């Protein structure tokens, strides 16, 4: 069995690279927006999967400007403004931008069941009445893991569910089993 450090590295690398630019979001699920906006969202999704949140937000903003009614553009903005594995918490400006996107999402109609579930997961982070970053992260993680379970054939949903499991994994010895399980899940996705 690999040691803890190598297993942790493998899981994080697998999560970051699961949906690389060569495997676009469009191959996992179709976005209910114009082709041009969908392509830009796919670029943003690839950046999100590689934890390039600042660059991803730029792509999602471009898509939102192209097509203001595209819910997945706002989803991307909301998701880009918290960073589950980065140290620290979102800045006040990031929280404001993410909350504004989540507020906008509440007025929009998703185009499919998976869009609805992905939007619900991102919005769970910004839900009213949740105090503190760890509680917000747990709210998002629970919803994101559920989304992954509801859409087992979606590489994107599975990758974000894996990220969610890592983000809320317990500290200490229990973390090893979570990381191992996530690694097994990602290995199975790569085998498809």
PLM regions with names:
Residues 2-12:
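Bacterial N-terminal signal peptides that target proteins for export
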Residues 24-153, 158-192:
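Short coil/linker segments at helix-helix boundaries
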Residues 19-21:
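N-terminal signal peptide c-region/cleavage motif recognized by signal peptidases
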């Amino acid at each position: 069995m690999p040691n803890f450090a190598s297993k942790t590295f493998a899981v994080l690398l697998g999560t970051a690279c699961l949906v690389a630019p060569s495997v676009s979001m469009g191959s996992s699920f179709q976005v209910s927006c114009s082709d041009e906006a969908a392509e830009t969202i796919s670029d943003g999704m690839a950046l999100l999967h590689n934890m390039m949140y600042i660059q991803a937000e730029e792509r999602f903003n471009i898509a939102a400007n192209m097509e203001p009614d595209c819910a997945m553009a706002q989803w991307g903005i909301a998701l880009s403004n918290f960073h589950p594995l980065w140290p620290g918490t979102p800045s006040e400006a990031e929280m404001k931008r993410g909350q504004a996107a989540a507020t906008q999402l509440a007025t929009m109609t998703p185009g499919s069941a998976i869009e609805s579930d992905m939007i619900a997961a991102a919005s769970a982070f910004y839900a009213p009445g949740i105090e503190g970053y760890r509680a917000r992260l747990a709210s998002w993680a629970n919803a994101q893991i559920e989304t992954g379970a509801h859409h087992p054939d979606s590489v994107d949903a599975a990758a974000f569910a894996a990220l969610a499991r890592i983000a809320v994994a317990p500290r200490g010895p229990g973390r090893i089993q979570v990381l191992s399980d996530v690694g097994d899940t990602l290995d199975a996705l790569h085998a498809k």
